[in-house]
Amino acid sequence: MFRRLIGVVVATVLLTFQLIVGSATALELDEATRTVPLNAQGDTVTLSLKQVKEGKRLFQYACAQCHVGGVTKTNQNVGLEPEALALATPNRNNIEGLVDYMKNPTTYDGVEEISEIHPSIKSADIFTAMRNLTDKDLESIAGHILLQPKILGDKWGGGKIYY
């Protein structure tokens, strides 16, 4: 009887603590954090809280099976960290560049099209997770990818040493 009472008290304290403290959500991201590059010309855009939330959900749905934590499972040398995106040709460190890649992916040097081996809108018949994604969805996913280094720092794309 006493053990049950202790268990109930501990559970109540933990649940109360969780309600008081809460968890990090999109609501806690300030406008400066949510501002990401829009294009190669240097324009920026501030993501709405809805875009942040939707981008995370869509990334988990369509991309995370291969890019969990910003790492590329099939090629550990190329991830989604800002440096790798900036060095790609054309560079992919902005929303327009990432959306273009999700529509028509190319090799890191930009020479060959790889839509048959990388999920994209172009290959939605093969990679069904991409089938119903709209341009707004792709922009939300791109925003999520560009936002993660600001939230996670070096963990995003850092690989096994962080996870």
From Swiss-Prot:
Its cofactor is heme c. The gene is psbV. The keyword Repeat does not apply. Transmembrane segments: none annotated. GO terms for molecular function: electron transfer activity; heme binding; iron ion binding. The keyword Iron applies. Residues 1-26 form the signal peptide. Heme c binds at residues 63, 66-67, 118. Keywords: Electron transport, Heme, Iron, Membrane, Metal-binding, Photosynthesis, Photosystem II, Signal, Thylakoid, Transport. GO terms for biological process: photosynthesis, light reaction; respiratory electron transport chain. Belongs to the cytochrome c family. PsbV subfamily. This is Photosystem II extrinsic protein V. PSII is composed of 1 copy each of membrane proteins PsbA, PsbB, PsbC, PsbD, PsbE, PsbF, PsbH, PsbI, PsbJ, PsbK, PsbL, PsbM, PsbT, PsbX, PsbY, PsbZ, Psb30/Ycf12, peripheral proteins PsbO, CyanoQ (PsbQ), PsbU, PsbV and a large number of cofactors. It forms dimeric complexes. It comes from the Bacteria. The lineage of its organism: Bacteria, Bacillati, Cyanobacteriota, Cyanophyceae, Nostocales. Its main location: membrane. It is found in: Cellular thylakoid membrane. It is a peripheral membrane protein. Binds 1 heme c group covalently per subunit. Coiled coil: none annotated. One of the extrinsic, lumenal subunits of photosystem II (PSII). PSII is a light-driven water plastoquinone oxidoreductase, using light energy to abstract electrons from H(2)O, generating a proton gradient subsequently used for ATP formation. The extrinsic proteins stabilize the structure of photosystem II oxygen-evolving complex (OEC), the ion environment of oxygen evolution and protect the OEC against heat-induced inactivation. Low-potential cytochrome c that plays a role in the OEC of PSII. GO terms for cellular component: photosystem II; plasma membrane-derived thylakoid membrane.
